Amino acid sequence: MISNFFTPCCSFKPVSNCCIGIYNNLSRVNIIIQLEKHMENRLAKFNELVPSTLPFVEGKLEGHKDRKNYSIVGPGVAEDGKQFIKIAMPHSFNLGAVSALPKNGSGLHSHTTAEVFIIYSGRWRFYWGAEGKDETILNAGDIISMPTNMFRAFENAGDEEGLIFVVLGGDDPGIITWVPRVLEKAKKTGMALLNDNSLIDLSVNKIPEGKKILEPIAQEEIKKFDNYKLDQLEKFIFKGNEKSKYENKLNDNINLIQILGNKFEKKEFSPVINQDTGFNLSILKSNKGHITNLKFEKPTIMFSRTGKWEIMIDNFQCVLNSKDTISIPINSNVNIKIDENEDCYLNCVTQI
């Protein structure tokens, strides 16, 4: 239809207002299409993500093999070089997710940047220290922000598959340091790390020329890592069943819980966890509410824990179902709406 209408109009000389109008309309349509494509690249529908089933060196071991790893924003720390990344653009933080069957999870390891776990479903045992002797149990709605320079691990302690979302600090969260026995046990299954921290399956691949197997760290190095007792680590834990103590009114129908950092958009709040992670973590709570004209000056993502949240970003509209994520362009106009029968929760992470 456009071509049939366009041709005769353009036969007039000089060029008619009709042609100019059509050209302008086509330009606007093209811009809208390009904007739609750009925003689609910022939208991560959880059911469209491709997980890695062998994301780390201990992935063939009992207690670790029945799990999936998702890279949603940024590469995270997955050792699988083929891990699918949905939103690759840098945000100064990473977002991932882990699902695991009962009695499965990660081995003891340490990170050089912040690692914040948001429990979506299930019952999880978190344990820490080089021997993994200290532990706590967390449930859906709970959050734990693990300090750097400490060994930590987690295991699904429930009766069915569970899900955790994980926020990691920095564009490059660095490498993982494993306790020696993890690497030693993994090697017996054929899995190893090379000295560039790339993952190799020795049962099907040879060590590339110029590379060698990464050796476990020495006992003297282990002593340099921090140890925490449960009462020391509790200040880094938010229990969802205590949320009413920390709720702030964002407007008449949306409450906010500030977990990390002290800012949501341009408003300041006291955080539940006082820790320098490099990002703000806020939770919006509502069943029927809306908020308009938000504007974020730093890289920001939103991801739904529960409920269908309608998000309008300038002229782009989407619905975030549970587990879906959207990356917000800097200085865009953002409107949020929720219409459910029970309280729902929307997570928001913004660079500090």
Q: Positions of the model-derived regions?
A:
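Conserved short histidine dyad/triad with adjacent acidic residue
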Residues: 78-82, 96-111, 280-297
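A short, N-terminal "cap"/entry segment at the start of jelly-roll beta-barrel domains
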Residues: 28-91, 194-285
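Double-stranded beta-helix
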Residues: 38-41, 151-232, 236-237, 333-352
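Short histidine-centered beta-strand/loop micro-motifs
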Residues: 84-88, 106-111, 128, 135-137, ...
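A short beta-strand-loop-beta hairpin characteristic of the jelly-roll/cupin
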Residues: 110-140, 150, 294-322
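Cysteine-centered motifs
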Residues: 9-10, 18-19
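Short hydrophobic targeting helices and cationic amphipathic motifs
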Residues: 5-6, 26
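Conserved metal-binding segment of the jelly-roll/cupin
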Residues: 138-158, 169, 313, 320-340
